Amino acid sequence: MHHTPPEAKFTTLTLFGISSGNIRWGLAQMGTSVPKLKQVPGLLFFKLLGSGRGKGFSIKPNFRRYGLMCTWQSKADADVFLRHSPLMQEYQQHTDEVWTLKMLPYQQHGLWDGQAPFTPVLAQPHTSGPIAVLTRASINWRALPGFWRFVPKTSQALDNAEGLIC
C-alpha cells in the first residue's frame, strides 16, 4: 500500500512595529487578541511574541515590536486571515510596520505548551534558500545569571551574522 506523507504545517511569522501613539494598545493585544485568534478558521496553533530591546536579548522589553507566530490548516486559511481578518485590519491601523514571513518547517525540537506545532515537517531536507530559526525557552531563575553572562557575546555574534533581520 502506498502512503503519502502528510504535508508540512504551513507557518507564518508576522512582526509588528507599533506606532508611537499606540504603545499601550500594542501591549494590551498580548491579552485581548487571544480570544479573537481562537476563533480564526484554519488556525491550528498561535503564539503572541514580545521582544527585548536591541537584538532581543534584553531584560528591558521593546514595547514597539511584537510578533505573531501561527501554524495553519492551509496556505489559503493563512492568506484569508492576513488579508481580510478584522484583527489584522486593526493591527494595520495601529502599526507603522507589518512584515510576514511564510514558511514550511523542515525541523522541530521540543514542545510549545505541550504541543509540537510544526509537525509534520517537510519530507525532503532543506537544500537552498533562506532559513528562519525560531527559538523559545523558559529559563529557570537559578540559570539566569549564566544566561545573561553569554548575552554580550551572543549579541556581538549577531552583529556579524549575514542576513540577520532585527
State what each model feature region is.
Residues 68-70:
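Conserved RNP beta-strands of RNA recognition motif
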Residues 86-95:
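A common structural junction motif
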Residues 1-57, 62-65, 75-81, 96-165:
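Short S/T/G/P-rich N-terminal loop/turn motif that feeds into the first structured element of a domain
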